[in-house]
Amino acid sequence: MGSISAIHHIEFIVSNALQSAYWYCSGFGFEKFAEKITDESTSIALRNGTARVIITSYNSQNIYTDQLIKHGDFIKDVSFRVDNLDAVLQNLVENDIKVIQQSEVSTKDGLVRTATLLSEGGDVTHTLFELGEFKGNFLPFFTPISNFELFENIEKMPAILMDHVVQNYPIGEMEAAADWYFKTMRLKRFWSVDDKVATSEFSAMTAWLLVNDDHTVQVTLAEGVKGRKGKSQIEEFINYHGGSGVQHFALLVEDIISAVQIMKSRSVEFLTIPSQYYDNLEERLSKTNLIVKEDLKMIRELNILMDFDENGYLLQIFSKPLQDRPTLFIEIIQRANFKGFGAGNFKALFDAVEREQEKRGTLF
């Protein structure tokens, strides 16, 4: 009681909602299905599987457009579903956590109650939704719309759900942020990666994975490490984003090879992984009894990362930054009886992003 049960949706603030919606539909298989238009803003709702994304743009200057100038297009809200909002609110009162906005909307489709919190140390908010028996298309005030016609007539790129989100923090602020999540949402620390793993000659980082009791909500927090001669990828994000924020979210898919092939055909670019990584992977796999149904040659060719244990494996791949600023990217992930988080790939991912930093000239 009094905890979150699932990611409901994420919301972007962008300069042009229609153009951004088209890009995410084109590259990542989303479809637009609902919209909310007011005198002040346009919001377009996208879906792929149960993953939901709202793309919002504003028509006049306000606090959100000021944040847009600061961050560029960015994820403003990571929303969660709760079963008992009253219990959550009581927990917030007990922990002296401020609710910045509450609403209760009753429509013919049912009752929706919300509470919005400002996260620790940044502009990201979390809206908590108690939906009960609500049977609407999406949320109150959103009306159904058709998808872009083009994407109704080309190959689909189906996702299952939104697997997790990752947020970056300035050096020294991650633990306070984690404590905020412990108190507000009753998340727990599941594992961590320190600067002995995510490290190079030039930079380092540390990260904590926070989960709810059922592991249906996974939030990773990351920060850079002091004392290195270069600038960590987390510090690069902080500089370009103008502070802490959501670095990426992950879409869970059933067939990552097919998904990546489709996305690459639509001009989505992914990080490249050295051949040595796959040589080592194949050697490690040869010493186990694990059966991998995917073609390892295709995994190598597509630059897909793999982590495994005695029970199963995980496949994951990371896009290059999706915007002019090297901030937001998207992860595609496939799980085969594997509940871990790709900890074995953290070093490979760290090195791949650092190589991109070096190309951009932002490592020093």
UniProtKB/Swiss-Prot annotation:
VOC domain: residues covered: 6-134, 161-320
Recorded GO MF terms: 4-hydroxyphenylpyruvate dioxygenase activity; metal ion binding
Keyword annotations of the record: Iron, Metal-binding, Repeat
Classification via Pfam families: Glyoxalase (PF00903)
Cofactor descriptive note: Binds 1 Fe cation per subunit.
GO BP annotations, alphabetical order: tyrosine catabolic process
SUPFAM superfamilies: Glyoxalase/Bleomycin resistance protein/Dihydroxybiphenyl dioxygenase
Family: Belongs to the 4HPPD family.
Name of the featured protein: Putative protein C31H2.4
UniProt source species: Caenorhabditis elegans
